[in-house]
């Protein structure tokens, strides 16, 4: 008998076996017991037993469609046969008489001088396993290539979108500065102080908008490189909103809330990470439910805001948020005064902002005290 722990070159012995084992400590005991049983049963018959760990040969496990360990495969003489489970020794004892008959009907090729037709089975199986492994690796490489091409296309789209977003405030600021320059060259009596102040205010406002856009870009880059692994895909945001709403039906019913769904059917797909955006929608819905009184209403809507962006909005008729706090609620651990005894918005909205920024989108709130709140976020349209 010959035995090895790796799939090697085929021998021309009349009996060939593969024994698949797992990594459990008692696997070696099974190997010894099965090997000893084969030696006893096959006394006088040369045979080859190769021992393979399933963790090292997953493609062969798939090739032979194995579902249990240990598994003993008789490759030769044909037909191939699989014995599996904890009672392999009993199965060997049962099948050995039949195998003796098969050996008698299939004389040893070495004795007849004929070229062996099946002893190369082990080598061919190993070759098939390698082909399957290479095929899987090629598939993964093609998938990675498609994802990279999508990411490159997405980056190009984002650059165009950012250029468009920056152009508007830049144009407005330039007009204000040009007008100020014209006023500067007029006689003092023709210079209008009120207009001058208004133009200065307008220019500062537009510069602040540009500064905020640039800060969002830098933050998005930071989030992509550290906290988040964004796996962008074409995403039907309407379907995702509907799925999340269905999961919250019990909570809506518990407070007798009226839910309005206002998302058009022709809304274009966005390019986003489905699971991350699901977290954002779920978090905003959690907050809306928490702060909406019993028998209140919540509206989930979306619109194609521009050719490059889709805006999603979640509106409640809760107590609202003071104007002075509408920016700070997106900071980690922030609590409104009304939330000191509750969980509040906390890290939830901070996480939402980071997720949306990582998608090169924006998130904000429109609210007035005692008039409810509308949380909005934008995502880039998939092209």
UniProtKB/Swiss-Prot annotation:
One of its GO terms (molecular function) is phosphorelay sensor kinase activity. Gene3D superfamilies: 1.10.287.130, Glutaredoxin, Histidine kinase-like ATPase, C-terminal domain. Residues 161-383 form the Histidine kinase domain. Induction: Expressed at the same levels in light and dark (at protein level). Disruption phenotype: Deficiency in glucose utilization and/or glucose intolerance in the absence of light; no longer grows if less than 6/24 hours of light is furnished during mixotrophic (MT) growth on glucose, no heterotrophic growth (in complete darkness). Accumulates glycogen under MT growth, but seems unable to utilize it. No expression of phytochrome or its response regulator (cph1 and rcp1). GO terms for biological process: circadian regulation of translation; circadian rhythm. Pfam families: HATPase_c (PF02518), HisKA (PF00512), KaiB (PF07689). The modification Phosphohistidine is found at residue 164. The keyword Ribosomal protein does not apply. It catalyses: ATP + protein L-histidine = ADP + protein N-phospho-L-histidine. InterPro entries: HATPase_C_sf, His_kinase_dom, HisK_dim/P_dom, HisK_dim/P_sf, KaiB_domain, Kinase_SasA, Sensor_HK_Regulatory, Sig_transdc_His_kin-like_C. Coiled coil: none annotated. Its EC number is 2.7.13.3. Keywords: ATP-binding, Biological rhythms, Kinase, Nucleotide-binding, Phosphoprotein, Transferase, Two-component regulatory system. It comes from the Bacteria. Signal peptide: none annotated. PANTHER family: SENSOR HISTIDINE KINASE RCSC, TWO-COMPONENT HISTIDINE KINASE. Homooligomerizes. Interacts with KaiC1. Interacts with KaiC1 and RpaA. Binds to the B-loop in the CI domain of KaiC; SasA and KaiB compete to bind to the CI domain. The N-terminus interacts with KaiC, while the C-terminal histidine kinase domain autophosphorylates and is probably responsible for self-oligomerization. The N-terminal domain stimulates the C-terminus to autophosphorylate. NCBIfam families: PRK09303.1. Member of the two-component regulatory system SasA/RpaA involved in genome-wide circadian gene expression. One of several clock output pathways. Participates in the Kai clock protein complex, the main circadian regulator in cyanobacteria, via its interaction with KaiC. KaiC enhances the autophosphorylation activity of SasA, which then transfers its phosphate group to RpaA to activate it. In addition to its output function, recruits fold-shifted KaiB (KaiB(fs)) to KaiC to cooperatively form the KaiB(6):KaiC(6) complex (independent of SasA kinase activity). Plays an important role in glucose metabolism, important for expression of genes involved in glycolysis, gluconeogenesis, the oxidative pentose phosphate pathway, and glycogen metabolism. Required for heterotrophic growth. Overexpression from the psbAII promoter leads to altered levels of genes involved in carbon metabolism, increased levels of transcripts for clock oscillator genes in the light and the dark, complete loss of glycogen accumulation, decreased levels of metabolites of sugar catabolism and increased levels of amino acids in the light and increased levels of SigE protein. This is Adaptive-response sensory kinase SasA. It comes from Synechocystis sp. (strain ATCC 27184 / PCC 6803 / Kazusa).
